[in-house]
Amino acid sequence: MEIKYLLTVFLVLLIVSDHCQAFLFSLIPSAISGLISAFKGRRKRDLNGYIDHFKNFRKRDAELEELLSKLPIY
């Protein structure tokens, strides 16, 4: 093998191994948090904040419709 092919193979292997290592190390914290949440049990979601957010969204949507209806048609 010529040195340029050997260097190319080495660089490709280095990049692939770096991505695999980063992938595995990124899975470890998510796996730990998943196990902790499985042992603790799921928390009940606070739906009040979600409902208020949805009401605000509906209010803004109605205000936008009103504003657009007042604009002249060009």
From Swiss-Prot:
State which residues form the propeptide: 46-74
Subcellular location per the Swiss-Prot or TrEMBL entry? Secreted; Target cell membrane
Q: Which organism is it from?
A: Olivierus martensii (Manchurian scorpion)
**Primary location class:** secreted
Q: Which GO terms describe its cellular component?
A: extracellular region; membrane; other organism cell membrane
The answer to whether the entry has keyword Signal is yes
The signal sequence is: 1-22
UniProt keyword annotation of Amino-acid biosynthesis present: no
Recite the UniProt keywords alphabetically.
Amidation, Antibiotic, Antimicrobial, Cleavage on pair of basic residues, Membrane, Secreted, Signal, Target cell membrane, Target membrane, Transmembrane
Summary of the tissues where the protein is detected:
Expressed by the venom gland.
The UniProt function text for this chain reads: Has antibacterial activity against Gram-positive bacteria S.aureus, M.luteus, B.subtilis, and Gram-negative bacteria E.coli, and P.aeruginosa.
Q: What is this protein called?
A: Peptide BmKb1
